[in-house]
Amino acid sequence: RVVRVAKEAVATRVTFLRGREEHSVKVEAVLLAAGKAPRVDLGLENAGIEYSPSGIEVNNHLQTSAKHIYAAGDVLGGFGLTHVALMESRIVAHNILNKNKVTPNYQSIPRITYIEPEIASVGMSEDDLIKRDLSYNKSIVPLGIVGRSVIADTRDGFVKILADKKTGRLLGATIAAPSAGEMIHEL
């Protein structure tokens, strides 16, 4: 998890947490590319919709302050990912048509960083578990022992699983490997 980005004389220093340890690297550039900035300068106040520069304000059921209007996707100012907008739009449709309202579960949204190798994760991170003081087991499997990786000569990487210490329930997972974004859905 990136905790700080600082411009130095010749480069940029990116500081991040790996577990509880802080590390840093010098880079030439930092790119953040996700979603779009929400357009909220449309006179939403005329419809009784509350908003801020970061997006339209909604309750847990994606309902705006105008109770007959719901919102989903980039206009909420959240993740800015297509699959999140799709999930939110399905929840909005359900909540409009049904009395039993449902809420989005953002813990189940996969996240992918397209670098070499790709890094994909889902659920809670180790930092999240530590902050919440949850007891968990951690298992890390290096790609070098996975037969398919050996055959494809892609041994650099790992799969990390975080599970509830008492129940064994999956709490989070990370894959660092070629095509990790395609594999994370299996977890």
What are these regions (language model features)?
Residues 72-130:
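A conserved FAD-binding loop/helix module that cradles the flavin
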Residues 2, 15-24, 36:
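A structured beta-alpha segment of the ubiquitous adenosine-cofactor-binding alpha/beta core
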